[in-house]
Amino acid sequence: MEFNRNGIHFEYPDNWAIEEDTSPDGAYGITVSAPDGAFWSLSRQPPGADSQHLIDATGDQLRGEYPDLEVYPRSDDIFGTSLSGADFNFSYLDLTNTAEVRCLNTPTACYIVFCQAEDRDWSRLHHVFKAMVTSFIRE
């Protein structure tokens, strides 16, 4: 499937559900959910937003929900575009989970990508999440 609205374009799997959200502060977000509960989200923040602050705030929010949270600073390079971020590991209901946050600053916006899945699904879905980010950056 293809999402192409509000200046944002990316591809996602046919059987995933999509939901849009606009906050009062003008931030715009999209969440794409897999049937098994895994999800990928993209949020558009104003240009010049502090990426490291957004990454840290994501970690702080997760730590508030999951005290055993492990955080690993990471970055990706896709088509020569650098994305800063972090990987997270935590337990929930006796299941281990992995999540990633990546930030992309452009002249027009700061984009935050967040994805999460149970570890038993992560090895399969990690490639889907990466393809979604790649399709977003390619545009």
Where are these regions (language model features)?
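Surface-exposed amphipathic alpha-helical segments
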Residues: 16, 111-139
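General beta-strand recognition
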Residues: 9, 29, 84-85, 111-112
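Short, charged low-complexity linear motifs
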Residues: 1-4, 108, 122
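Loop/helix-junction capping segments adjacent to catalytic residues or to phosphate/diphosphate-binding pockets
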Residues: 52, 94, 119-123
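Signature of long, low-cysteine stretches enriched in small and polar/charged residues
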Residues: 57-108
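Short secondary-structure junctions
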Residues: 2, 15-22, 63-78, 135-138
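Secretory pathway targeting signatures of secreted, lumenal, and periplasmic proteins
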Residues: 2-56, 60
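Short beta-strand element of the conserved SAM-dependent methyltransferase core
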Residues: 32, 42, 86-90, 136
